[in-house]
Amino acid sequence: WIMGHMVNAIAQIDEFVNLGGNSIETDVSFDDSANPEYTYHGVPCDCGRTCTKWEYFNEFLKGLRKATTPGDSKYHEKLVLVVFDLKTSSLYDNQASDAGKKLAKSLLQNYWNNGNNGGRAYIVLSIPNLAHYKLITGFKETLTSEGHPELMDKVGYDFSGNDEIGDVAKTYKKAGVTGHVWQSDGITNCLLRGLDRVRKAVANRDSSNGYINKVYYWTVDKRATTRGALDAGVDGIMTNYPDVIADVLNESAYKAKFRIASYDDNPWETFKN
């Protein structure tokens, strides 16, 4: 999965997919009442990027729905996965469940079209703080009470705080999550980060009793870093330059081993060689 980073304006969906992305990451900020409000990152952000592009969250979802609904004039067949980077650090810990409930309602209405031919992309809820795991339970409860538990088949999870792998595993137990797990590792492109924790995550993914299904590394803009991540065995790379990742995947060393995921590739299944 080539994951376009910080896609917060509707116009950027086309831009990042046309550069080679089959996945996008979108920032979601919340108001004081835990309503998802804007797709907005703010300052500071990655080097070389504009930090302040934004939409109202529900409007972004409508644009995203068009981009992922077959037959729509804006449809992109290859856009198959969306990571919502949930900026919950503005919330109190006890608001996490409410944030999940309100997020589910927004997605149900504006993205899934109340279960009636909505957008088809798989969704990853990426949470920066282990203490906010009740966002997941609130989200699940709401889709169930609104009569659409089947949409949980399209939803996965990520804790993005670079926490100890063992602590993340314990948190998923508390949240009642037993699958659909992506594990991120990374840092802003302005700084360097080694691959030690990525390798630990990959080892967990490939062990018989691990909790991780997929591992992604962020934010990767350079060819050398891309090669390092691929050599470590990641499933996804988040980038400001999807074309750079696509180029490296075309190199003879990687062409035979990796391909770009399509809609038929289940993002919740651990890939077995």
Curated annotation (Swiss-Prot):
Organs and tissues of expression: Expressed by the venom gland.
Superkingdom in the source lineage: Eukaryota
Enzyme Commission number, as recorded: 4.6.1.-
Keyword tags: Cytolysis, Dermonecrotic toxin, Disulfide bond, Glycoprotein, Hemolysis, Lipid degradation, Lipid metabolism, Lyase, Magnesium, Metal-binding, Secreted, Toxin
Requisite cofactors: Mg(2+)
GO molecular-function term, one example from the UniProt record: lyase activity
InterPro entries: PLC-like_Pdiesterase_TIM-brl
Record's cofactor remark: Binds 1 Mg(2+) ion per subunit.
Glycan attachment points: 250
Pfam families: GDPD_2 (PF13653)
Catalytic residue positions: 5, 41 (nucleophile)
Identification of the protein by name: Dermonecrotic toxin LdSicTox-alphaIB1aiii
Originating organism: Loxosceles deserta
